[in-house]
């Protein structure tokens, strides 16, 4: 990719959080989006709440859809393009699923024919309503909907890998039916990359939808294990971007870093700016990155109860729209990168990944796993590592297409960084 990467934010309304759809105020939305645009960002990701938009399986509320269109138009008036998440789904520790899928109407979210037909119609309806808006980027099927399919969810809708793939393809196709030619994709949390046996897989992420999507959160054990300023913490997003690539059928499939944030106390507030700058720069040292979308635009109003503590302060701006250190750091980095952007050179050294689709393979990729730790030792040693599956490590044509000239086995990575000059 030679185009300058996109820089955006996940929009968290200042008044009422995502419950603002119940008391929708376009003036509040406009003020929020003004404060986002002032940071120099170019897009937002927005979140309808599924139960509010589709309270009955055969009812997608026209007024709710009109409000979504008004929000998207307000963003466009401020030079912001918009990605819309459909099935919300899961947000900041809360689940939002409609009553027609729970309790007396309990049905599997991924396999019940009536539920999946209702979901597809909902996604098609939202996409169709926005299809003629030039500032509409496309749909994301939902926010980390994979969380509903397996542990540690308290009430999972269990499915197989094949059923997950079928569901994803159907939902992406529904988005395409509503808005042909836009950028439609799906999003998982890092269980897809790190959890053995999870039904949503790296191959699903890298082969279904218009681009691959990663969400990077260092509260997953990375910062706890390595510390807030360690290579592993500041390179976690870059690692996920590179880990996403080997499964792609196209060697230069775009990868979107769709969520990344500075969660306290794992990243102390006094380090939030430095962490933001390092994370963005490291992510953009990976080839084929479509863009970086920070979580989130504004802090959560502390008058709202029961959020995990770290969720309240993830904003680039405060709840009263004042720029925080992370927001200032991102704005400065964006301005500089737009002026000086050059596509990163290929990562010529790749770490070989064994058994990633089998028992133990994905766990090795997680923080503390043998593959994760070897990759981070290489990164700390000045190498710019890529990732390659064992089955393609001897495929000269595939390696050449990705710009890889050297492959390294995890067992051959020294246990302690040696500090030569940068390689790869």
What kind of region is each of these model predictions?
Residues 2-209, 292:
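Active-site mouth of glycoside hydrolases
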Residues 39, 78, 250, 286-287:
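Structural motif
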Residues 60-68, 234-240, 272-278:
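Charged helix-capping and loop-helix junction motifs
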Residues 119, 286-424:
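Aromatic-rich peripheral "rim/lid" segments of glycoside hydrolase catalytic domains that contact
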Residues 143-145, 218, 296-299:
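Glycine-rich beta-alpha junction loops
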Residues 162-165, 179-265:
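Glycoside hydrolase catalytic-domain groove-lining segments
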Residues 245, 280-284, 331:
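Generic hydrophobic alpha-helical scaffold/packing signal
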Residues 266-280, 303-311:
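Histidine/acidic-residue-rich catalytic or RNA/ligand-binding cores of hydrolases
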């Amino acid at each position: 990719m030679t185009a300058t990467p996109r820089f955006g934010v996940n929009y968290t309304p200042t008044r009422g959080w995502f419950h603002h759809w119940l008391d929708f105020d376009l003036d509040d939305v406009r003020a929020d989006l003004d404060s986002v645009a002032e940071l120099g960002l170019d897009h937002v990701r927005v979140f309808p709440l599924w139960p509010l938009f589709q309270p009955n399986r055969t009812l997608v509320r026209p007024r709710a859809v009109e409000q979504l269109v008004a929000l998207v138009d307000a963003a466009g008036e401020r030079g912001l393009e918009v990605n819309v998440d459909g099935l919300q789904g899961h947000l900041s520790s809360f689940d939002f699923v409609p009553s027609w899928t729970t309790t007396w109407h309990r049905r599997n979210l991924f396999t019940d024919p009536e539920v999946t037909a209702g979901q597809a119609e909902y996604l098609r309806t939202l996409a169709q309503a926005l299809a003629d808006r030039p500032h509409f980027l496309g749909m994301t099927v939902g926010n980390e909907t994979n969380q509903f399919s397996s542990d540690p969810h308290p009430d999972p809708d269990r499915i197989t890998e094949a059923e997950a793939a079928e569901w994803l393809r159907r939902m992406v196709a529904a988005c395409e039916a509503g808005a042909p030619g836009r950028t439609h994709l799906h999003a998982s949390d890092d269980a897809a990359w790190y959890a053995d046996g999870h039904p949503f897989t790296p191959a699903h992420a890298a082969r279904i939808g218009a681009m691959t999507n990663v969400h990077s959160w260092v509260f997953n054990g990375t910062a706890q294990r390595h510390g807030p300023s360690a290579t592993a913490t500041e390179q976690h997003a870059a690692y996920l971007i590179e880990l996403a690539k080997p499964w792609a059928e196209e060697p230069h499939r775009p990868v979107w870093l769709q969520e990344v944030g500075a969660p306290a106390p794992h990243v102390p507030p006094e380090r939030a700016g430095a962490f933001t700058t390092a994370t963005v720069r490291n992510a953009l040292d990976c080839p084929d990155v479509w863009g970086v979308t920070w979580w989130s635009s504004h802090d959560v109003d502390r008058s709202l109860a029961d959020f995990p503590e770290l969720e309240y302060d993830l904003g680039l701006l405060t709840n009263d729209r004042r720029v925080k250190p992370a927001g200032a750091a991102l704005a400065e980095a964006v301005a500089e990168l737009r002026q000086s952007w050059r596509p990163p050179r290929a990562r010529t050294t790749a770490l070989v990944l064994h058994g990633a689709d089998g028992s133990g393979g994905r766990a090795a990729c997680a923080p503390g796993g043998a593959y994760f730790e070897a990759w981070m030792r290489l990164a700390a040693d000045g190498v710019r590592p890529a990732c390659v599956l064992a089955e393609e490590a001897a495929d000269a044509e595939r390696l050449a297409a990705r710009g890889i000239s050297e492959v390294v086995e995890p067992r051959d990575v020294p246990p302690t960084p040696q500090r030569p000059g940068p390689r790869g």
